[in-house]
């Protein structure tokens, strides 16, 4: 009986020690989430824009007002390495941290968001869809390199925005979704920036648990979704973001940043 009690105590102690380790999933889930904001197009609405599209298209004046609010309110932008270290080890962050992210390589992110962020010393994360590089209304490789050189982070957003939960492997690399959508775009961005690509965002923000072990094999430190609940087993691969909706007033945006995380 005594041996059983000792063995039980040892197991309980081991479980407590394991759960307290800074890098495990339980510890990561226990840390307070940091606000992460997602942008797509930054331009004024057009007559043909649908109601749904307007959620993803923030008018220029609204974008500028929202960034000014963040600066006036004392927010400090952080980059993914800082967020990763905080989640893994509890490393310190600046007061009122926030991350600004931009999806899909839209040219207005370079022409409008970049100079506006510079006014306040803000940095951002740009999730690049490599099929779009150099196309009309999208950034060029040179512009992506410039963003990287200026201290922003370049990250992957697949080749052409296909949903990750639909990917399949194939003996032919040209037909293997993981090669086409993950491996090749990552290498392309590393060639452009001269830096390792450690971060990824799901197209449409969509993911399903069965893909997470496979995605983990590709070495991304953090993967970003939208506002769905994080996966308790893979919190680093399901980091939450909120859209800064084109419909939102500055007050609504401020409240969402404060209360969504």
Mark where each language-model region is.
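Positively charged n-region of N-terminal signal peptides that target proteins for export
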Residues: 1-4
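Acidic (Asp/Glu)-rich catalytic clusters
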Residues: 114-122, 139-157, 216
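Short beta-strand and adjacent tight-turn residues that come in two discontinuous sequence segments
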Residues: 127, 157, 223-225
């Amino acid at each position: 009986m005594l041996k059983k009690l000792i063995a039980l105590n040892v197991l309980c102690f081991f479980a407590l020690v394991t759960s307290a380790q800074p890098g495990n999933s339980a510890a990561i889930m226990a840390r307070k989430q940091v606000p992460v904001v997602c942008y797509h197009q930054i331009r004024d609405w057009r007559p043909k824009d649908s109601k749904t599209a307007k959620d993803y298209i923030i008018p220029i004046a609204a974008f500028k007002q929202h960034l000014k609010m963040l600066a006036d309110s004392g927010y400090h932008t952080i980059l993914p390495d800082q967020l990763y270290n905080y989640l893994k080890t509890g490393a310190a962050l600046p007061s009122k941290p926030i991350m600004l992210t931009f999806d899909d390589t839209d040219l207005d992110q370079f022409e409008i968001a970049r100079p506006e962020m510079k006014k306040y010393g803000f940095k951002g994360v740009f999730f690049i869809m490599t099929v779009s590089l150099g196309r009309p209304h999208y950034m060029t490789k040179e512009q992506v390199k410039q963003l990287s050189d200026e201290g922003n982070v370049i990250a992957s957003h697949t080749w052409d925005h296909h949903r990750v939960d639909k990917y399949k492997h194939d003996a032919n690399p040209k037909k293997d979704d993981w090669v086409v959508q993950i491996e090749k775009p990552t290498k392309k961005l590393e060639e452009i920036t001269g830096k390792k690509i450690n971060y990824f965002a799901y197209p449409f923000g969509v993911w399903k648990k069965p893909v997470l072990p496979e995605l983990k094999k590709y070495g991304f430190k953090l993967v970003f979704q939208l506002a769905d609940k994080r996966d308790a087993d893979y919190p680093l691969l399901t980091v939450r973001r909120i859209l800064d909706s084109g419909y939102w007033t500055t007050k609504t945006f401020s409240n969402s940043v404060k209360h969504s995380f």
